[in-house]
Amino acid sequence: MDNCIFCKIIKKEIPADIVYEDKEFLAFLDIRPLAPGHVQIIPKKHYRWVWDVPNIGQYFEVVKKVALAQKKAFQTDLIRSQIYGDEVHHAHVWLWPENGSGAKENFKENSELIIKNIK
């Protein structure tokens, strides 16, 4: 999709603080974070809704991997998740640590913490 901001991030036309990337999926820090380490996880192929992603099991394995990294990175037991779709018409899952440590505006530090804890 030519006007999709997430597709532009995938193509590296728009910069993003990427915390995870593989052949199928990309995870990056939200530019308007609700909390330190707030991440968007998207498929690299454009799908309108999460439920349209054919390899949804693999998608949620990535969601789990990022959530577990956030849990360690921000020293919290609670990672919130939400599936949206109205604001950007590209499948995406939000993940953010509840009551986590750190400042939400520290993009570089927050991305490094998540990357360090992804297994």
What are these regions (language model features)?
Residues 1-119:
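HIT superfamily nucleotide-processing domains
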